[in-house]
Amino acid sequence: MPNPVRHGNKKDSGGSASTMPESSGSVNNKDRQRISSKHKRHKSKHLRESSVPEPQTLSTLKLVEYDDISSDSDTFSDVPAKQERRENDERRPSEKSDKMHKSRHRHQHKRLKEATRTKQVEKERKPEKTQEVMVNKVPSSKDKIISSAKRTADEQEEHGRTSKSSSKDSRSKMHKDKSRREREMKSGHKERSKSHRKRDSSKRYKTSDSPKRKGRSPRRKYGGSPKQDDSHSEGSCGQDYDDSPSRVHASGNFNETYRKNMDSPSYKEPAAYQSSARSPSPYSRKQRSVSPYRRRSSSYERGSGSYSGRSPSPYVRRRSSSPFVSRRSLSRSPAPRKSAKSRSRSPLYPRKSSSSSRSKKQKSQSRSRHSSISPARLPLNSSLGAELSRKKKEIAAAAAAAGRESKGSPLILKKESGDSRVASALDLKKATKVLKLEKPVSEPEMVTATSSETKTISAKKEESEKKPQVQAKDPKISGLKDCKPAAIKEEVLTPKEGVTDRDKDVPPLPPILSPPPPLPTSPPSNIPPLPPLPPSPAVLQQPPPPLPPPPTLTFLPLPTTVAASLTSSHYVRQSSLSTQANSQLPVPSPAKPQPPLIHMVPHMKTSTLPPLPLPPLLLGEDDIESPKEIPPPKSVKKEKDKDRPRHLLTDLPLPPELPGGDPSPPDSPERKVVAPPQPPLKKRPKICCPRYGERKQTETDWGKRCVDKFDIIGIIGEGTYGQVYKAKDKDTGELVALKKVRLDNEKEGFPITAIREIKILRQLIHKSVVNMKEIVTDKQDALDFKKDKGAFYLVFEYMDHDLMGLLESGLVQFSEDHIKSFMKQLMEGLEYCHKKNFLHRDIKCSNILLNNSGQIKLADFGLARLYSSEESRPYTNKVITLWYRPPELLLGEERYTPAIDVWSCGCILGELFTKKPIFQANQELAQLELISRLCGSPCPAVWPDVIKLPYFNTMKPKKQYRRRLREEFSFVPTPALDLLDHMLTLDPSKRCTAEQTLQSDFLKDVDVCKMATPDLPHWQDCHELWSKKRRRQRQSGIVLEEPPAIKAPRKESVSVPGGDAMKNSSPAPTQPVKTESSVSDLAVLGDITQQLNQSELAVLLNLLQSQTDLSVSQISQLLNVQANPDMQLQLEALNQSITALTGAAVPPQEVEPPKETPTLDQVDPLGAGTQGEVQNVLAVLLSQLLKPQEVVDAPGESNGEQSGSNPTAHITLEEEEEPDKHHEQNEEEEEDAGNYWSP
């Protein structure tokens, strides 16, 4: 087993066997001194404050002896390890977190080892056991005998202590026998706690680098001398405990160093620890208890929030496990530890410790124990050591004789306690004198005083506790194991986790850890469990001694009330209290009187003063949880404890009430937890409600619909990550724009620009910002994306045109009112974006969309980003299309503002008046040159900060220009010119904002609703893609250039309703006048159109694009019109008029009726005769148009325009011709981008 080996290591380090106690001790002392020397440098100040360095040698020797004992106890603990392991396995889940914390507190492991060793030794040698228990600090029975002989000589000098101590020793022996029996009875619980401790300690030891640390760990943890507290212990241990269990884990190494420091003489333990080393046999026991005390501290810490691994607090786990026996064993519950301590060490000590924690005397004793513990390591004075040895010898003799005698009589115990008090006072005086002689340090003196007090008190308590504790322990054991109510009481005790341990060992820790008197307040929160556990031992101890009863009475009531209140409050404070306890555990080294170590300092001071130390012990215990109400509650608690100890044993069911109280707090938190979750659940839907509302508008959830829900009409644009299609929702008939997001070329998954656009558009809801309706995919199943990367489509409301397409088409002329309306809407949308802290960063004419009603919307937020006006941070300056890029970006500015968007809008304003971009360059330097020519050269005179820009010197214009903007735009109305001048200011800090533009004379009085709707080409959707294709066709010399020229006049003569009618699928009203066609033509066309529906017209339009010429007979055949002379004349007239208009000799002919599939065959040959490839494409398109028409009479859409399903729709020749030409253009565009169309 790893534990046995480690125990062996410990033994070796500590003086492996009792046979070699002193020599091993000396070696260990040397090692410790070496280790301490490392820390001495850093902690010299703390050493000065906390304790005298000289006594360290003595204390180290004693420590070595103690280590030997602990190693023996470790061997004992190995025997019950299996059972303990079983129990531990059950408790492992809770122990795991504790183990993390336990790594710090190896002293607990010592307890386990000592307990196990004591069991084995008890089996092997009961007499030796009694001797060893009497002399807990002595490494072996031989060492103990030798030390006892020396101590007897010293003790003879001391006043009646020897007789009292001898009686106490005999009693302690008797009590030890009883405690052994009790241990056997409680062995199950102890073994659990031991095994738990064992594993924890073993794990701790594993974490520790050396066995020496293991043996010393208990002392080291607490012994981390005040020096260590200030520097190392505070920093490491205090932080570890205070911070959290996580810290405890993280500081495993820290704990090791901390332990090393404690071992080293430089790390003198607080005076309390030191004094205990020299204290008589009871002190030696106390020292053992001290090590358990350290274990307590660890267990306490474990129990406390920092050891939340087992449970956020001892209360929680104990609550959870009504059998606190297991909890005790797991969490080092005070009762099992008491029994273990009493067994391995004299039961008097545990009793003393518990009684000391419960009574003022006990408090002082526990503090003195701490001091005595530290003296054990740090020999404050040879005189103190002699006194301690004397006391130990006297106590041993007295315990052997008087222990047996006094077991039966509480009066004797009381007397002994009174005598012990007197002796303690004398001892304190002596110790303080010796300390003063050795060193003037007030802390050591206090420690020695406290140690002497603890010695006398411990002796008294041992005597008083012998019978009551044995009896009480047995009932506790039986009650804890057998009775759940008893378990509940112990649970209350156990919640303190080692209340017994603390009383026995922890009381010393509290003095160091909990000097602050505020502990009483903290006890209410955390102590509630602690008082109950000590009360049981204290009850045993306290009832016998009449002297302590008054303080015990006062103390007991508090523990019960405090236990109740603390149990309830402890749950709330568990984590914080545990952290406090943990911090206090490191604070144990607070022998220093540093204010941060207030807890330690008060303890030291209180330990020097017998009455004061008593409250501090309770405070110490309480301090671990909270150091607020220390002194007054302690006395009350002592009295209550004295009364209740018996009552606690009998009133075990009452503690269950405390646990009940504890559960109630958890219940309340649970209720709270339940309540908060519900509100969040309610809140989350509220947050989502608006989005769900938007989705409800489309009656679909984003991403769940497939793109096949839309009929794709055509391609209208190309974006950075895909094409933009015009489509119609099959369910609603609504036109939409599908922006394709292709994933096949994306190495990083979804394009960041698309993600940005989606994220921003969902936050921007404005009438002047394009609305994204939903997102659809082209895969029905998400798994399809793995096989073949699919695509997403952003579904936007459809806008008929964009500003670039309209301006380049030449089909529209904007009046000043139109420009006002456009700019008003544009700047409203931009102001909205800027108020939302978004920069568009890509404003250009092609990203400004219009519909046929003249409504403007800002689109394409792929480059937009959130910006913070409060913090200036750099952004990329490679944004905004070059023609619309402001001068600051051209000069390398990275900390730009929304003014960049205003410049782009200024460029658009000038473009609306000039019908072309005002700055058209293909390079940044050329662009800056054009800007300089119009707006003046950037110079510090007009733009002070321009010299700070990165490219100011490298991109200076060749020539300095003056501002000529007003001259160049003199034709612009003055209000518009003023606005343009302001928007195109070089200095961005002087440039107007979007809000200011709306307040300008040009826009402030504009009412968009009252503005006249611009005459837009309803027959043609003017988008950037279409405009670019037209431009290429013009450059290539294709004749299709003419249709726009023809359309422009038509647009003027044709009323908007006609185009709208076609797009809205409503019958188009006949046009009364047409400039380029005769009335006779209109009449002829009217007659023909009456026989056609829109679907037929669509087929005809497609057909006409492949035909350069159609004879009347062909038209009559295609349209199934009887070739009577009148009709032939009409068709000829129509053909001639169209030929004249288009110059392409392509008469717009009506479409064949969809019912005639043969027309497809006829069309194909016709087309084949004229244009080979084009005709093939058109034939395919025609076939696709006719197939759906055959299925459904509803007409298809021509040129992306909705065609009405009304078969009797009447369309005038103009409408026919416009769609024809529009269709021709679209078809040619489709030829260029034929692959975009999916057959």
Swiss-Prot record:
The GO terms describing molecular function are: ATP binding; cyclin-dependent protein serine/threonine kinase activity; protein serine kinase activity; RNA polymerase II CTD heptapeptide repeat kinase activity
Q: PROSITE patterns in the record, alphabetically?
A: PROTEIN_KINASE_ATP, PROTEIN_KINASE_DOM, PROTEIN_KINASE_ST
List its EC numbers.
2.7.11.22, 2.7.11.23
Q: Where is the active site?
A: 842 (proton acceptor)
Q: Where is the composition biased (Basic and acidic residues)?
A: 81-100, 113-131, 140-172, 179-190, 202-212, 459-506, 636-649
SUPFAM superfamilies tied to this protein:
Protein kinase-like (PK-like) (SSF56112)
Chief location bin: nucleus
Functional summary from the UniProt entry: Cyclin-dependent kinase that phosphorylates the C-terminal domain (CTD) of the large subunit of RNA polymerase II (POLR2A), thereby acting as a key regulator of transcription elongation. Regulates the expression of genes involved in DNA repair and is required for the maintenance of genomic stability. Preferentially phosphorylates 'Ser-5' in CTD repeats that are already phosphorylated at 'Ser-7', but can also phosphorylate 'Ser-2'. Required for RNA splicing, possibly by phosphorylating srsf1/sf2.
The UniProt entry, under Pfam families, shows:
Pkinase
Q: Where is the composition biased (Low complexity)?
A: 300-337, 345-357
Entry similarity comment: Belongs to the protein kinase superfamily. CMGC Ser/Thr protein kinase family. CDC2/CDKX subfamily.
Domain Protein kinase: where?
Answer: 710-1003
Q: Which organism is it from?
A: Xenopus tropicalis (Western clawed frog)
- Basic residues bias locations: 35-46, 101-112, 191-201, 213-222, 285-297, 358-370
**Stretches with biased composition (Pro residues):** 507-552, 587-596, 653-667
- Residue ranges, compositional bias (Polar residues): 15-28, 273-284, 448-457, 570-586, 1063-1074, 1199-1209
* PANTHER family from the UniProt entry: CELL DIVISION PROTEIN KINASE (PTHR24056), CYCLIN-DEPENDENT KINASE 12 (PTHR24056:SF126)
The subcellular localization recorded is:
Nucleus; Nucleus speckle
Q: Which reaction does it catalyse?
A: [DNA-directed RNA polymerase] + ATP = phospho-[DNA-directed RNA polymerase] + ADP + H(+); L-seryl-[protein] + ATP = O-phospho-L-seryl-[protein] + ADP + H(+); L-threonyl-[protein] + ATP = O-phospho-L-threonyl-[protein] + ADP + H(+)
Spell out the InterPro entries in the cross-references. CDK, Kinase-like_dom_sf, Prot_kinase_dom, Protein_kinase_ATP_BS, Ser/Thr_kinase_AS
Taxonomically, what lineage is the organism? Eukaryota, Metazoa, Chordata, Craniata, Vertebrata
Q: Where does ATP bind?
A: 716-724, 739, 797-802, 1023
**Enzyme type, top EC level:** transferase
- Gene3D superfamilies in the cross-refs: Phosphorylase Kinase, domain 1 (3.30.200.20), Transferase(Phosphotransferase) domain 1 (1.10.510.10)
Designated name of the protein = Cyclin-dependent kinase 12
Annotated region Disordered: the residues are 1-421, 437-557, 570-687, 1037-1074, 1146-1168, 1191-1239
